[in-house]
Amino acid sequence: MFKENKNKVETIIKTSEEAPSSRLNGSQRLKESGLILAFLFSIFLAVALFSFNPADPSWSQTAWGTDIHNAGGLVGAWLADTLFFVFGSLAYPLPFITAFAAWVLLRKRDEGDEIDFTLWGTRLLGLTIVLLTSCGLADINFDDIWYFSSGGVIGDVLTSLALPTLNILGTTLVLLFLWGAGITLLTGISWLRIVEWIGERSIAAFVGLFNRLRGEKAERVKPALVKPELPVEELEPTFSASMDTEIDEPAPSLRRFNIHMPEERDVPDIHFEPQVEPKVELKPEPPRQREPAPHFSRVAAQNTQVEPVSSARTQQWDATIEELEQQARLVDDYAVEDDAVPSVLTSSTLSDVEDSILTTAISVDEEEESLSENFNHSFNIEVEDEEVEPSIANLHWSDDEDELEETPSVMVSPAIESDWEDEDEPDDRDVAAFQNIVSQAQANAAAQQNPFLVQKAVNLPKPTEPMPTLELLYHPEKRENFIDREALEEIARLVESKLADYKIQAQVVDIFPGPVITRFELDLAPGVKVSRISSLSMDLARSLSAMAVRVVEVIPGKPYVGLELPNMSRQTVYLSDVIASPQFKESKSPTTVVLGQDIAGDAVVADLSKMPHVLVAGTTGSGKSVGVNVMILSMLYKASPEDVRFIMIDPKMLELSVYEGIPHLLAEVVTDMKDASNALRWCVGEMERRYKLMSVLGVRNIKGFNDKLRMAAEAGHPIYDPLWKDGDSMESEPPLLEKLPYIVVVVDEFADLMMVVGKKVEELIARLAQKARAAGIHLILATQRPSVDVITGLIKANIPTRVAFTVSTKTDSRTILDQSGAESLLGMGDMLYLPAGSSHTIRVHGAFASDDDVHAVVNNWKARGKPNYISEIIQGDHGPEALLPGEQSESDEELDPLFDQVVEHVVETRRGSVSGVQRRFKIGYNRAARIVEQLEAQGIVSAPGHNGNRDVLAPAPIRD
């Protein structure tokens, strides 16, 4: 992305390094002054220690009227005496240690040369250990200096504590090993490498000495050892030269673009082919040595078992169509070879061999073979010709195979011949028509058994795990997060320079690289407004050769401005990574939904019960449907059908229809928008019923309701339904209250629902969004048309949680989020998440779930149980008793103010057309059509006939 600007970056770096070389700033002046004073103190300390005289007055003794012999004077005598008293002979290295520490801490550094506090912390720990152990060793092994202990007070304390328990030898060993560990922490020297080096040198010296003693044999061995090394030595200069030439070229650009990443992805494809082919070739061979009758069925069974073993979940993801076709050809070749064996046997010894495949094929094609037998006069030849495709018959008539095997196959042909010898020969057209019917039936059977089609009724084994496992999802290979610090620093300098071109002074203070984007946090100079940078987002994207640049005006908790740039190589966030994260595992709510990962790569999950409703919007292809599927799959990983139930509305009949048949569904997936209003009306009625139950029990939400039911059941006092009345059911006693599950209503395309049904849907959704949170009913609304007529103010006011994918304009972004930013997203799951009660958006890279992942989880739940659909959800009840509180029927709508005048006009003129009403009263077509529909509802005019005309049913007025 920044390859074209590399030369500009280098010039910026050079100018920035040459400019500040004359003067030091304030902090650098203080550091350099402190460094000079530290060197002066180190020199003074060394002079005082090396010129120490025990006769000088000091902290240890007092002298009166004597000359001071220490070169540092009275201060030097006191300082040296104190250090000798504390450290003993280990006081001599202290001046050098002080000077070195001052140089490390206070010297002038480059802008990119930062202090690694972890490294220097370990070095400081190592230095402390070395000083303490050295004092202890000196106290044990060395004589005292003057009247001071050789290890000082520190050595005396350590030895007095260790000698009573460890003795001299044990104390020495412990201190020596601690001293070695301190040296490793201080210098980083590996004692193991030193031991290996000493061992290698010792072995080499021993081998050389042994070869010299061997004489002539040693001379024979030397040329054999030297010759292989010569070409290596000759190749080394050429290799180093080539490396030098590559290094002289712009090497950082090569590292920046990560060219080696696609090569690593192609490696698994090379290993898949040799792993699959031998298994397909070797499996069918052993049955050939056995009986021919069960051969084909065993091959089919083995083929079904080979597929999961030879192609794992990751291999299925990377497999190509060519590989699948090649494997299919191999299986077909073996099937043809197996079919050739029974055909030869039937022609020679049909009465001695009982072949299940042949008899099954003959049972299906009896009539076809008998018809063609009259024209070819050779039954055996016809069997060989028709024996090519017995697989369809074997699949469909496997249940009758045992009955057919009881009779010898040789008895079939005489029966067929005797039946058709007495009849007349049919016409060629009848034979051709019958053959077409048979071939079409076989083709339909083959199409139903196609493995690439979705099987509606599949008997799957019931899983033993209580919830779906991670093995159902695709697991990507381990990816190394390579971060090029030099490239990031160059980009940071480039950002600063481009902002300087627009007269904006800013400094990059923090860089946060992520899987998709990298955020640069800018510290603006005093007086610079954030709006200036926001208005330059397009210009910055052009200057930085980036696809889009997003400006984060406010970062919570920081006084900086964020600048988000897309990475050169984008990583895919998979659903398995987020579900395996601790954030998802630690969440206890059954309505936990997965969103993806933030810019730092951390998992982002949310609780739908706290949202409590979410609006998902974005253009076509931005990842909106994948995001909705990820939310549903995450709840399927957390909740059982007793905890969460779904009502899914899918106008496109593609995205949510795959969930048909899971036990979580309350009704079939709604694909007709006219039924969608009934489903929403049922949700409103269920919400009202739940509120009545909660008011009777004295709880405030669904969690308290379920907890109270559980406590009552544990106490032995179950609660009966207080809203039950006589006649509601066939039972004489009210039923017990059961646990209420959360209900999640998922609408994949909300705009289509608004266009078809209209204002009623908006009112129903508004009622659910206002009151349904405590009742445990939550909405997930998705739309690809973020316009104000779809996302109305009434809906936005009641759905505070929004998720915006890529949109085309700032207006659409403001429609969804009430702020701009979504127009700068990168697509393919890149989203802005606005939590409830917050005005700051969070950039999230949406998790990806493939179709295979969705089918795997859905089949896992289908194997656990079947759904218990409620028919009233879709069918509804349009009677007056089914009206919700505050709802009016269509007949109770207010009549138009011109209704009476239109009635008078229609009755007099005896014409009830819409165009006539429109011309007479000079109104719009929609209003005129509405008035005519009201006339039809009142029985004044009839319904339109086949020609569109309406008859006036009301009698004409009586004239005097």
Curated annotation (Swiss-Prot):
Its main location: membrane. InterPro entries: FtsK/SpoIIIE/SftA, FtsK_4TM, FtsK_alpha, FtsK_dom, Ftsk_gamma, P-loop_NTPase, WH-like_DNA-bd_sf, WH_DNA-bd_sf. One of its GO terms (cellular component) is plasma membrane. ATP binds at G621, S622, G623, K624, S625, V626. Residues 193-960 are cytoplasmic. CDD domains: TrwB_TraG_TraD_VirD4 (cd01127). One of its GO terms (biological process) is cell division. One of its GO terms (molecular function) is DNA translocase activity. Consists of an N-terminal domain, which is sufficient for the localization to the septal ring and is required for cell division, followed by a linker domain, and a C-terminal domain, which forms the translocation motor involved in chromosome segregation. The C-terminal domain can be further subdivided into alpha, beta and gamma subdomains. The alpha and beta subdomains multimerise to produce a hexameric ring, contain the nucleotide binding motif and form the DNA pump. Essential cell division protein that coordinates cell division and chromosome segregation. The N-terminus is involved in assembly of the cell-division machinery. The C-terminus functions as a DNA motor that moves dsDNA in an ATP-dependent manner towards the dif recombination site, which is located within the replication terminus region. Translocation stops specifically at Xer-dif sites, where FtsK interacts with the Xer recombinase, allowing activation of chromosome unlinking by recombination. FtsK orienting polar sequences (KOPS) guide the direction of DNA translocation. Homohexamer. Forms a ring that surrounds DNA. Belongs to the FtsK/SpoIIIE/SftA family. This is DNA translocase FtsK. It comes from Vibrio cholerae serotype O1 (strain ATCC 39315 / El Tor Inaba N16961).
